[in-house]
Amino acid sequence: MTDEAEDSGPGGYAAARLRLLTEGARSGPPRRRALAELTDGWLAGLFGAATEEHTGISLVAVGGYGRGELSPRSDLDLLLLHDGRDDKAVAALADRLWYPVWDLGIDLDHSVRTPQQARKTAGQDLKVHLGLLDARHLAGDLGLTASLRTAVLADWRNQAPKRLPELRDLCAERAERQGELQFLLEPDLKEARGGLRDATALRAVAASWLADAPREGLAEARRRLLDVRDALHLATGRATDRLALQEQDQVAAELGLLDADALLRQVYEAARVISYAGDVTWREVGRVLRSRSVRPRLRAMMNGRNGGKPVAERSPLAEGVVEQDGEAVLARTARPERDPALPLRAAAAAAQAGLPLSRHAVRRLAATARPLPTPWPAEAREQLVTLLGSGRPTVQVWEALEAEGLVTRLLPDWERVRCRPQRNAVHLWTVDRHLIETAVRAAGFTRRVHRPDLLLIAALLHDIGKGWPGDHSVAGETIARDVAARIGFDGADTAVLATLVRHHLLLVETATRRDLDDPATVRAVAQAVGTEHTLELLHALTEADALATGPAAWSSWRGSLVADLVKRVSGVLAGEPQPEAESAAPTAEQERLAVEAFRTGGPVLALRAQTEPPADSAPAPSSPSSPSFPSPLSSPSSPSSADGPEPLGVELLIAVPDQAGVLPAVAGVLAMHRLTVRTAELRSVPLPDGVEGSVLLLDWRVAAQYGSLPQAARLRADLVRALDGTLDIAARLAERDAAHPRRRGVEPPPPRVTVAPAASRLATVIEVRAQDAPGLLFRLGRALEAAGVRVRSAHVSTLGANAVDAFYVTRGEGTPLPGDEAASVARGLEESLRT
């Protein structure tokens, strides 16, 4: 210890502490031990300077400090233990200990108790009891500290049947509140499931002698999380356990890792080890407690049949697999070394029965099972399909296989996606867990398709290409071909699986970003899919993939668009005649709105909550001649109350005399009223014979971001002002943004605007990918107006914080843009979004 550290004063300790944290070794156990030892010496010096009495009183470290796990900004958990002597003298001693800690700005969790008080408090407060399990003597009466440790540990073991269920419930409640560490983009290293608190809970279970946690990899997982927390404290200068996005690169650099993705992957791997150990441990705790509550033979008699005879302790599930005490285990006659399909058979049997696969069984399979031949025998492939088709129980069984490395042994390509983060707020899961979740969802659709096996394998493989650079669909197609052949599919089935993986995004992207009335759109999808059976599989895979992604990726609105596209493509594949591309004639309602707009010289608004209005009714227009339009855009019958986070919304029809600036004006007014645009179409409507002039008709589907939708009359009034220039939409939106600034985390990727070649024969398709923000469509509309192009239709899609929009644009006379002009418009749009 340095001379400065030997100085019991705050200055000496502070200097030595600073030197250790800034000039010492990187984050890791040696530095944590050194920091704990340095702090121990300082506190012992404070204790010695504050009192000459060393009997009947001691200073004790508890909790994380008791374990010697001091991170740079950790608080100090201290207990001043005394034998009940003069309270004033003890209080004075406590002040002489606590104030120097506070003077250095170190957080302190402190208490002053007798051993009896400490035990009583521990009996009433589970968290206090957990902290005392890690009690460590610092100074004073060693015997007093040792006696407390012995008593607290004895209490813990005696009370384990009561305390462990409380601890299990505490862990479950915390997991529900904080989420799972292994899937969060900004995880709490301490509180989330699989974090440091769960690791501490497993130590407490082991201390009870009632059950023990799996030890393989657990200490290493805990060390990794502690190392990350150390680096996080140094990077932020704060006592935080939340690994925020903006700190991840700096933390990765502090740990010598390549980048933030490598950091998250290490964190996820550690959390997965701790989570799985927790699952196994708590199952064992439950088993032991059940066995203590009822004698085994009595329990067997109570559950028995045949005149009360005891039932067998083992029930067969499959060849070589039995159920025992709520788990799937290997039969006594099982020989993994002679049965290469046994790992998959055991996993499938466990999942089908809704049982966890015993850890002992998995370890034995991993240690002794022979590798499968290539190609796999039919039984192995069928067992994999059975496992994937078991629904929700598949997840825990797959995690058991993963914990012992069996998944990557069966599917080597899995290693590239294992624990791989997805830096997209839309995704709830890592890549590998998303693939399993997709299979779980697909299991519910197996009655919709003619080949459930192909659907389930495609679900497992559809994002496998994310472990390689480039377009993951293209990379995934190659991997899918290799995997399909390796596991025993024939050439035809392999081709179908490759098509499903290559085009797993085709339906949803086309349905939400393309004009489905354009025959070229439908023909392109039909050409890519090839057959009706493949289309059927792709439809089910699309929905399963989206549902497994997260709530922002699927809704009744998206589902209806995809179903419409599938119906049209199915017609093409069936050889049904397709209509030629032409502008649809206006309906009677649209023509009526156009005439009203021309007559009044201003915009006319109408709404339609249903997809199709009743034949004998039409929505009343909102115009100067009908000022009493009373109802808001929402109504009890509106599909906005449909299930899913994205309601269909309402159809908003706007007719306005042809003039410049209509698109940005409408988009801006809708943004002002916090309306989300689902789809947008704009076209010129000819007036009846004998009437000169033209009217623009905008057919948009909108929904409120939150709250109720505004009155149509309010929308019309603001639109009139926007069109005549008396309403400065840009200023209003800027004013609102300034009044409610959004917290910024990491800098989002820059916007990207591209031209989609050959996407339509009717128009040029310009795709925009950008960070979603209020008024984005308004800004795009202004830029398109400035470019002098006409917008035929817009297809708007928002996924989490990402906007993916497609605009069908033409020249003024209605023809597609030449290539160079289209590229120039795209560049202009991109520049407008960057400024």
Swiss-Prot record:
Keyword terms, alphabetized: Hydrolase, Magnesium, Multifunctional enzyme, Nucleotidyltransferase, Repeat, Transferase
Superkingdom in the source lineage: Bacteria
UniProt biased composition (Low complexity): 631-642
Region named Uridylyltransferase: 1-316
Gene encoding the protein: glnD
Organism whose genome encodes this protein: Streptomyces coelicolor (strain ATCC BAA-471 / A3(2) / M145)
Protein EC: 2.7.7.59, 3.1.4.-
Pro residues bias spans: 621-630
ACT domain boundaries: 651-736, 765-835
Cofactors demanded by this protein: Mg(2+)
Protein name: Bifunctional uridylyltransferase/uridylyl-removing enzyme
UniProt entry tagged with the keyword Nucleus: no
Keyword Glycoprotein in annotation: no
